A protein has these predicted regions:
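N-terminal signal-anchor module of multipass membrane proteins
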Residues: 2, 6-41
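A structural signal for small-residue-enriched, beta-sheet-centric alpha/beta enzyme cores
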Residues: 2, 22-25, 55-56, 145-147, ...
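Hydrophobic alpha-helical bundle architecture
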Residues: 38, 283-290, 294-296, 306-372, ...
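Flexible, glycine/charged-enriched surface loops at secondary-structure junctions
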Residues: 44-48, 88-93, 114-116, 194-201, ...
Length: 431
């Protein structure tokens, strides 16, 4: 039984981790740091230096920046300085205009931006931006561990702000003394008074709209549209399954291509927010579940993803869709009428299937991985509802579902570190 204090901690946790985002969150995170540094400087910077962790670089190299028609960090940094407002968080660039983009292009052409790999940091999410003015002043800002967590601010060498979480031993599982388990996640989502969790429906509104707006343009590899066209429908048919894939693909296509379309993120990732939301919404609507069931399924999906990501970390070598799709599989299992035991079956099936999918940066082809993840989510839920799950004698699956999750985390957070280095090396050295 969850205590009242635990329930309030969980609500605060979800509200902190499920927030709107405009554009891929890694370059946006750098833009956010730049905007804050510019605000501290008090004028337009003459020169900007960014020192970034490998995972930030990896995820920012090939992804579109909203409203620019451009990819990568330079334009994100330039716009962060020119029109960014740190109070907007992950929507820092929502005031972008064509005029600002042209000004940003000139800023880049004048070689005012330096981007560097910080090889010394142990943090996978690390951003340090230093802005210099023409008259010799400077401002430095750091973001660490979470995409909106400012850990250090200084002006002209004088410390303005420091967070203890920016130094020392990493604390992956935050939320005070809150220790989540899958059972706690399930109990919270299925028993909390509906009025206290209805805020999660904002994710449905934003991410459904993102998929719908994607139909109005040509984005990325047009995966969502391909699934909706005669060839896709001829192969997959008109089914809940095909609609789940197309809705997820559409939203991701637009986001990765840099469309000015906000989405609700999960644990600092818009794609994870899409993956945790759209499959659940499509299934609930077409399965004729009640509004309450949809709300509870969305909370189960998002909170499961948060629980796993708390231990895995915001960035890792493991593709985030593995985590978020595990959440959506739980939500779909619940919508099918599944019990807690069947939800655990779905989680084990997901871990057995998708563990090891690498993250090779944020980019348009992420839509392919998301649809792979959510198709597996449906398959895992179907098997779970029939009482079938991967057993503890098979591979990395343990009889205890939380230990199975810890096994996934161990592989993604620790064992794949060398893989992560090799992936980045390949990406930066391609001809």
């Amino acid at each position: 039984m969850l205590s009242s204090n635990e329930c309030q901690q969980i609500i605060a946790l979800v509200k902190r981790q499920v927030v709107p985002a405009m554009g891929c969150t890694e370059p946006i995170c750098v833009a956010l740091a730049t905007s804050r540094a510019t605000e501290e400087l008090g004028c337009r910077p003459e020169r900007i230096e960014a020192y970034l962790s490998a995972n930030i670089l990896k995820n920012a190299m090939g992804v579109g920046i909203p409203g620019t028609g451009m990819v990568g960090l330079p334009i994100a940094i330039a716009l962060g300085a020119l029109i960014g407002r740190s109070e907007y968080g992950l929507e820092v660039l929502k005031n972008c205009t064509p005029e600002a983009v042209e000004e940003g292009k000139a800023f880049i052409k004048e070689e005012r931006i330096g981007i560097h790999l910080n090889e010394a940091t142990q943090e996978k999410l690390y951003v340090e931006v230093v802005c210099h003015s023409a008259d010799g002043h400077s401002a430095k800002v750091r973001i660490e561990r979470e995409h909106t967590r400012f850990t250090y601010v200084e002006k002209d060498g004088e410390e303005r702000f420091r967070s203890d979480l920016g130094a020392g031993e990493e604390t992956k599982n935050e939320g005070g003394d809150l220790q989540l388990t899958l059972k706690k996640v399930y109990d919270f989502a299925t028993t909390m008074p509906l009025a206290e969790i209805e805020f999660i429906n904002e994710a449905r509104k934003l991410n459904e709209a993102a998929a719908q707006r994607s139909l109005d343009g040509n984005y990325g590899h047009n995966l969502g549209k391909a699934l909706s066209r005669p060839l896709g429908r001829g192969i997959l048919g008109e089914s809940i399954f095909s609609h789940i894939l197309s809705s997820t693909g559409l939203a991701c296509d637009a986001r990765m291509a840099g469309a000015m379309i906000p989405v609700m993120s999960n644990s600092g990732s818009g794609n994870q927010g899409i993956c945790a939301t759209n499959p659940v919404v499509v299934f609930a609507k077409e399965n004729h579940n009640t509004a309450e069931e949809m709300t509870r399924a969305l909370m189960l999906s998002h909170l499961t993803a948060i629980y796993i990501k708390q231990n895995l970390g915001a960035l890792s070598a493991l593709c985030g869709c593995v985590v978020a799709a595990t959440g959506s599989s739980c939500g779909i299992t619940y919508l099918m009428g599944g019990s807690y035991e069947q939800v655990t079956f779905a989680v084990k099936n997901m871990i057995a299937n998708l563990t090891g999918m690498i993250c090779d940066g944020a980019k348009p082809s992420c839509a392919l991985k998301l649809t792979t993840g959510v198709s597996t989510a449906v398959l895992s839920a179907m098997l779970a509802m029939q009482g079938n799950c991967v057993s503890s004698v098979e591979g990395i699956i343990d009889e205890d579902v939380d230990q199975s999750i810890r096994n996934l985390v161990s592989i993604g957070a620790d064992s794949m570190n060398e893989t992560d280095k090799r992936v980045l090396d390949i990406m930066v050295n391609k001809c």
